[in-house]
Amino acid sequence: LHSTSRRQRQMCIRDRDIVVCLGGRIAESLVFDDVTTGAVQDIRQATERARDMVTKYGFSDELGMINYSTSDDEVFIGREIGHAKNFSEGTAAVIDQEVKRIIESCREKATKILKENRKVLDKLAELLIEKERIGQQEFEALFEQNDETIEEM
């Protein structure tokens, strides 16, 4: 059996994954005051992770520890893509609400983190324009140069 603290840790880890997925889009909005379609994959991943939290892993107080994943989660060649649901439209609406709640909560966390670290964000944007990609050491060095620390969320 999962203890409450273990369940909370697992939810926190998944929340962090979603916060990271949303970070690029939010940073783009903060830095350029505009958004592009570049973050479409990140948004898809964030949404899938939030939906999995609700439908597969039972991380929803509203719905409880019930698996609501559909049989179409794994699509095979030659099989039509559809959504055979084993739950009501009302439950589907609650699932959508829970997914939206998780995404919104993670969006707020990502926005807060990026605003609190705006100097680092601006330097990171400059560095990425120059190099396109950076490694973990370069990323962490940005925080050290600006007397910031990477804290646990």
Locate each region found by the language model.
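Soluble catalytic regions of large protease machineries
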Residues: 7-10, 14-153
